[in-house]
């Protein structure tokens, strides 16, 4: 089967090995019942605490922002880093909200912009290859999107079996099913069947799976070629999806189709895609996942790290 077999609850989850996990789960669950403005305030405070606990991640975020936007003054980079840290703290609670909030509460603070692009693709008999940008609130956004159009996505198993159980079933609440992260054929099959499939094109997957094209101010950024493989082999139309904050709550924004990706030469296509991604990230740069080393992989082993 292409879909991952849902993990089952095990009585061993009640043993001492998982007690600390359960404490964290109960605290998160309790906080999710608070009003959203209060949850956001708690999240911001948590983000500041995270900055004290893992200062290396703060340093990585600051470096990524400075590399991507070399035109920014140091004060602006510092301000964006602080806000990104607050959003990182909020992401912990947004994940819990995405897993456990009742549907009525999600619908009340969630909206979708650009869904007509999905409808148009489906009317043409095409699948939708949703290129989802790795924003902090992605977990919550996927849950909200599922109430309008259930999606399919790759799944990476969590190392903690209890968290994996909660994570899988939380993500599956409003979506169709999930595919093992290495099962490319299953994703292509789903796209050929006119499904909406979500894929993260903006991560560093290593030198062997990438070519180096510009992203913002970094002229040689490892960019996955798998994105084009799916766009070319499947009966689909690619389009970018992003999740954004609003005064009301959250929004998934869907951008115009990019059928040209499948026709362009590989380097030109990925350069074009990265240009679009960087432009969209700049709409709410404080929400992007800057804390991972996006520019870790360099073209050659002898190249100096951008993080030293």
Predicted regions and their residues:
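Generic secondary-structure boundary/loop-capping signal
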Residues: 103-109, 115, 135, 159, ...
């Amino acid at each position: 089967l292409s879909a991952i077999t849902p993990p089952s609850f095990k009585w061993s989850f009640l043993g001492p090995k998982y007690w600390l996990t359960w404490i964290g789960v109960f605290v998160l669950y309790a906080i999710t019942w608070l009003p959203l403005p209060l949850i956001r305030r708690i999240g911001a405070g948590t983000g500041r605490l995270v900055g004290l606990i893992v200062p290396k991640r703060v340093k990585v975020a600051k470096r990524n922002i400075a590399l991507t936007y070399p035109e920014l003054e140091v004060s602006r980079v510092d301000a964006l880093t602080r806000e990104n840290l607050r959003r990182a703290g909020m992401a912990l609670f947004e994940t819990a909200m995405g897993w456990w909030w009742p549907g009525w509460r999600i619908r009340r603070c969630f909206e979708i912009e650009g869904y007509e692009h999905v409808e148009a693709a489906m009317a043409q008999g095409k699948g939708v290859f949703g290129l989802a940008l790795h924003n902090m609130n992605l977990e919550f956004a996927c849950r909200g999107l599922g109430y309008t159009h259930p999606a399919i996505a790759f799944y990476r198993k969590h190392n903690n079996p209890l968290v994996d159980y909660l994570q899988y079933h939380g993500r599956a609440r409003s979506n169709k099913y999930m595919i093992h992260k290495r099962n490319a054929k299953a994703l292509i099959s789903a796209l050929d069947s006119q499904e909406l499939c979500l894929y993260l094109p903006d991560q560093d997957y290593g030198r062997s799976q990438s070519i180096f094209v510009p992203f913002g101010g970094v002229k040689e950024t490892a960019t996955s070629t798998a994105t084009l493989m799916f766009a070319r082999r499947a009966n689909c139309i690619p389009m970018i999806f992003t999740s954004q904050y609003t005064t009301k709550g959250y929004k998934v924004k869907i951008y115009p189709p990019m059928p040209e990706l499948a026709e362009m030469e590989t380097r030109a296509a990925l350069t074009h895609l990265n240009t679009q991604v960087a432009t969209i990230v700049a709409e709410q740069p404080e929400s992007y996942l800057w804390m991972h080393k996006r520019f870790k992989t360099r073209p050659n082993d002898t190249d100096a790290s951008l993080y030293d």
